[in-house]
């Protein structure tokens, strides 16, 4: 009985020791993505609702914390980067969540977002990781889009 307990303690000690071997700055983004990769929002400047539009969090990013996220680029249908005044309205928060205020002035259209992910030792840009579709308010309501907050 004592040998069994001693053996379990030794195995537990080895297990805890091996956890210390994680390389600081480890970052893997090969499987990164969003389950729903399209965020549909309304172009409705008259909306009284102040809850921002939000995407879900990114999945498949593995690494040592802290892991940071920022918008690397926002591109229009033709692949050109949009003006800074438009891109500045797309914020990336916490775990890679895209957030756009209800009172945004982003023109109607389809946009592709590149996301920069980095930590202490590594940095990756994930091109075209998400799509943002800005529709006239009536079309967004008719398509059944969800406004997440």
Question: What do these predicted ranges mean?
Answer:
Residues 20-149:
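Non-catalytic macromolecular-recognition regions in eukaryotic signaling proteins
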Residues 15-18:
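C-terminal motif of bacterial Sec signal peptides marking the signal peptidase cleavage site
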Residues 2-9:
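Sec-dependent signal peptide recognition
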